[in-house]
Amino acid sequence: RYDKLLKEGSLMIRIFKTTDSGIRKVAVAEEGCWIALTNPTAEELSTTADQFNIDVDDLKSPLDEEERSRIQVEENYTLIILDIPTIEERKGREYFYTIPFGIIFTDKYIFTVCLVDSPVLTVFMDGRVKDFYTYKRTRFIYQMLYRNATMFLQYLKIIDKKSDEVEKKLHISQRNQELIEMLDLEKSLVYFTTSLRGNEVVLEKLMRNTSIPRYEDDEELLEDVIIENKQAIEMAKIYSDILSGTMDAFASVISNNLNIAMKFLSVITIVLTVPTIVTSALGM
């Protein structure tokens, strides 16, 4: 059934293998392959689970947007779930949030499971990563984790740039639209910070994990991943603090402007009331 799905050209299941000419897509799963599942159907999950002796619930877990980051060691495979950053366009605006991403390590293959074709993975599929080999499974995991950490940093810089642009607009016109955009960016930073801290726990456990072979040549790469992730956490915190301070400052400005407007209206009301009082008094 699995081979049939592949022959039918499933877009949800793709198999990649490193050859002398680089990364290429193959039709049959061979030892040392990378099997990528992107938003797979129930049938594809079931056939994959049966073919490779993986619990179907573990394959489904990364497809649940509420799934928490963790490492789970089973008898014949290890499941790693962490959060990755993503962008979604709604009504002409970009929204930043995170979704789960699963890596399954077996003695022959690497599986990845995700709801979308994330830039975290597409660079590997396109052969744009140096020293990437599907059969070097431990290094491949570290490379994906490193790519994920750098994507967080990249998106954080975009969020910071967007917040600067919105702030400039607020200086000119304090409209609700700009304030809502600032709130959305602040919410994105909260998502990122929470996800990065969850990923940090996974990385710490990965350092102590023995189910995935560790090689001396790859140790530095894992250390780099941890450093990049910590840097992303610090950057998210700094940007969040700055954004919160900016929001508070503009809230104070708006409140002051409102007070001034209310005082002005009170004066106008009194001025308009005086003639009425005088007229009433003379009428009496």
Please report, for each region that a protein language model flagged, where it lies by residue.
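Peripheral, non-transmembrane regulatory/ligand-interaction domains of membrane transport proteins
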Residues: Y2-Y215, L221-D224, E228-M235
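Hydrophobic alpha-helical transmembrane segments and their immediately adjacent juxtamembrane loops
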Residues: N53-I54, K230-M284
